[in-house]
């Protein structure tokens, strides 16, 4: 059970924003290949694998079972990079705004991944124009890294 739990944690830590699940799919294919299970990827990016059937002591075949799971995660899309390295992001999925403050995130870019932290502006310091905008602030150590 510990290995199953760790495998699940490892999969959940792989970035897989909706529409960008290739890293998760590659990890699943690699894990299955390591135990000799052939896989294929369909045109939508789904990983498909088949396991040999089993029979009981009386020779009765077990029923076929399909396991289906999402590979994607909730996340953000970068809408603007400010001169000081601040990223303005828009939520992708049903993330509750109140739950995001001070959360550690991974910003995935063409040249690699960078750690970031979601920050929010105090309500009394937010201008009326900013209150209606559906993005959150995210900052990285320097704008050079962005």
Region roles according to the model:
Residues 1-138, 142-144:
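N-terminal hydrophobic/helix-forming segments and targeting peptides
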